Amino acid sequence: LRFAYESFSIKPAAILILQILFFVQDSFMQQAAEFQIQDGQLLGARQIPSPNFNQRPEYTDIQLLVIHNISLPPSLFGGGYIEQFFQNQLDWSVHPYFQTIEGMQVSAHLLILRSGEVLQFVNFNDRAWHAGRSSYLAKKECNDYSIGIELEGSDDLPFEQAQYDALVKVTACLQDYYPKLQQHIAGHSDIAPGRKTDPGPYFDWCAFRAQLQHYKNP
């Protein structure tokens, strides 16, 4: 009787442990499944195709993730101007600043809005026009072998936590699919020093890397 009682009393604890393990595993799988890559598309991102891209050089591996910031007009958010800019649909007459970038044709693979929503403009298999004249570890033309992520923001304002959360999830997904990205993440200012300053002093690299590490190893 004592053995039977002890065996019975152990079961609820064992069941509780199993439930916790299944919950943790299920939560992790749900997080991992939030973004997936299929044929160069980021599933879970809103697709807004940009005409500003070309083919990567043949046999080029994706090996660098570049983080930028952008706001149109500078330090003002919302309005959809970034999306219009990347699609060559921006009305240059709307704001005086737009006239200073009139005719420019640029893009990024991804844009993370202040709300944390992720937009994809260029397929990862293609070469987005985000880096310009650039070099990383003595290798020039970073557009050839990188993925560019724009954060809606500016050098003089903090980013939103929702943007860090989305960036962490997207980065983890990209690193899983493109293993070389695990060791190679840079800011635009790192690959174009003296020419570019983004993502700027308000981008918290330490917090981003710590959150990414915790997300990948909960």
Feature names for model-found ranges:
Residues 10-15, 72, 115, 154, ...:
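Residue-level marker of positions within ordered structural domains that often coincide
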Residues 30-41, 140-145, 154-218:
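Basic/polar, cationic surfaces and motifs that engage anionic cell-wall
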Residues 23-140:
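N-terminal catalytic cores of peptidoglycan-degrading enzymes
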Residues 149:
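Conserved, mostly hydrophobic/aromatic
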Residues 8-28:
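Short, Lys/Arg-enriched N-terminal segments with co-localized hydrophobic residues
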